Structures are given as C-alpha cells and as structure tokens.
C-alpha cells in the first residue's frame, strides 16, 4: 500500500465529527496539531507496516511479531504523554485486505488541565479495516485531569468480513490525589460503521449540566473509572454459532460477577459490549484482558497473545 492508497482510504472514510463542534471552542490555526497515519499491507512476509507518516511527537516503533508474521503488534508513542490546551492529535490506521494489527500504548494517556481560555484538547482515532482484516485497539487508560476541556473521538470503519476488538478506559480526575472531575468538560464518541452503515454509536458528555451523572446509579455510580470494550461483528445467522455466543456471554458475565466492580455484558446487534465502573483503572484493564482472552478465539479463532509491554 503506497501513500496515494492511504490517502484514498482516508478520503473514502472521511466522516463528519461524532460530536457537535459547537459545544466547545475550536482549535485555532496557531495551536499545535500532530498526526500519525499508518498503512499496513499483507505480503509474503506477513502483515507489514508499509507506510508511516507523521507530524509532531507522535510515532511508532518497528512492529513486533510475538505471534508470527501474520499479526503485527504496534506500540503507539507520544513522548509528551498528554494533551494540553490547543493540542489536536489525529491517529489513522489503514489496514489493507487480510491483515491483522494490534495497537497498544506503553503507558497511560493524559489530558491535562486546560488554560483559562478553555481551548479544546482534541484527539481523533480513525481505524479503516479492509476486507478479511482484524484491528485490535487496546490502549492503556486515559486520565482526564480536573478542568480538562477535551473531545475524544474513535471512528472505526469495517469492510466486508472485517473484525474489531477494542476498548477505552477513562479515569475522570485524579482519584489517588482525592481530586475528582468537579470542573471541566469531556466529550467522548465511539462509532463503528460496517460497509458504510452505522452499527455502533456511543456518546458521553460531562459538563456542568450533566455532572450529576457521576453519582447517579444509572450513571457512573460514584466510580471515577469508566471502561467500555466492544468486539465484533459476530456471525449470528448460524444456530450453532449463536449457541456458542451465548456460552461466551455467560462466561464473560461470570468474569464480571467475580470482579469487584459494577460490570456487565450485553449483545447489541452483532457486537458484544463489556462495561465496567471501578475505583481502580488497573482492575478494569485486568477484567478486559480476561474478557479479551475469551473473545479473541471466539471471534477470529486465534488464541490471545498479550503484548510484552503490558508486563513491564
């Protein structure tokens, strides 16, 4: 896949923002923008990182292949470690046909306190997955500092028979320092399109008008950590497959029941959702890893192989 092909893919999947842009100040021309665009192809050497274009302090190391050459493990690096006022990060991964890519991060992402002018801190992740390919998006948690003003968008575009497993773990405030997210503004969007059709749309807005959601039982139930895991699409047309999916969901629910958190599992259309609320982001991550170990072989018939960086 060459740069021209990457550009064509990006233009093909260009969508309007998940979140209305009128709600927060826009990024001005004087603010810092960084981007990373990755292109993956299938060759005789397996899944290879064919192109890597970037601007600013956002890049990746060479791929790792702990599972063999067909699956590339990618570590996404952002040396500043977080977003300050006016930052805009755009991460794009274009997967050509028959590729398998797992992307993770070496540490937590951070969105720091905004300046007094409350200029937007914005991150867009766009994952374009071609036919018969798999994208695993498994970053570490994102910490939203009190008084951050941020918009975080995840856009996933799946072609025919493409698969996705991903999660996001968000820490509101600094609970270890007894600092909650009493001030600030956060918007999160998670969207999956399958062959151009919208299949999943999740949206969360935290501002002064909705801050009661933190304490509400139907909201975050007093927990500062909010985790969401999504996997699919699963084939529900075959009766035997449906039975095995029921067994998978039952097993995932047992993991949630044994976990000291407010967690649950649901099947929405062709996608499995795992949600978790907790006081400890590491506990949510461990629950999601347990679920991933079962979801992965059920979805793609391949056992889990944890990125080595998770053990450091």
Swiss-Prot record:
One GO CC term, this protein: cytoplasm
Pfam families: UreD
Compartments it resides in: Cytoplasm
Entry keywords, A to Z: Chaperone, Cytoplasm, Nickel insertion
Domain of life: Bacteria
Keyword Chaperone: yes
UniProt keyword annotation of Chaperone present: yes
InterPro entries given in the database record: UreD
Main location class: cytoplasm
GO molecular function, one term: nickel cation binding
Homology family: Belongs to the UreD family.
Entry function: Required for maturation of urease via the functional incorporation of the urease nickel metallocenter.
Subunit text: UreD, UreF and UreG form a complex that acts as a GTP-hydrolysis-dependent molecular chaperone, activating the urease apoprotein by helping to assemble the nickel containing metallocenter of UreC. The UreE protein probably delivers the nickel.
Annotated protein name in UniProt: Urease accessory protein UreD
Species for this entry: Marinomonas sp. (strain MWYL1)
